[in-house]
């Protein structure tokens, strides 16, 4: 039996959460937990370990870089992929400096390419 990867997805756009959750769950290789509220997501992160965190950068209440900082304080080895519609170099560099493993651009070119990228991160 193959290992199921536990994935936490944090994005304020419910359409993104639904799309990614359905896509990843369909493969049977992932156990997906989603949150549209970053504060609730941090609470879940404090109670459960995840193989991967997919984290939107632009969110109300607390932006993704602030969430990333809290995640890395708890687990400096956590694999995190930042999701952004903004490819500004400063945000990408800051997320890497804060400990993000990688980033992806929204909208996604294809969900299959997106999955390849997260599998690459999970297996690194």
Which residues are covered by each model-predicted region?
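Two-component/phosphorelay signaling modules centered on CheY-like receiver
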Residues: 14-33
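Acidic, metal-coordinating helix/loop segments flanking the phosphotransfer/catalytic sites
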Residues: 34-52
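Acidic catalytic/metal-coordinating carboxylates
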Residues: 36-37, 63-66
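Short amphipathic alpha-helix used as the core "switch/output" element in two-component signaling
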Residues: 43, 65-76
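Receiver (REC) domain active-site loop signature in two-component systems and cognate sites
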Residues: 59
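Alpha4 helix (beta4-alpha4-beta5 surface) of REC/receiver domains from two-component response regulators
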Residues: 66, 87-104
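Receiver (REC) domain switch/output surface
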Residues: 113-124
């Amino acid at each position: 039996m193959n290992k199921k990867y536990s994935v936490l997805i944090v994005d304020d756009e419910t359409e993104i959460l639904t799309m990614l959750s359905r896509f990843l769950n369909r493969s049977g290789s992932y156990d997906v937990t989603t949150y549209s509220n970053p504060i609730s997501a941090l609470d879940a992160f404090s109670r459960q370990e995840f193989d991967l965190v997919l984290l939107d950068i632009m969110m109300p209440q607390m932006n993704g870089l602030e969430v990333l900082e809290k995640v890395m304080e708890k687990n400096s080895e956590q694999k995190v992929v930042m999701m952004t519609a903004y490819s500004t170099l400063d945000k990408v560099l800051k997320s890497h400096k804060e400990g993000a493993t990688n980033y992806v651009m929204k909208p996604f070119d294809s969900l299959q390419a997106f999955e390849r990228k997260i599998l690459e991160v999970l297996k690194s």
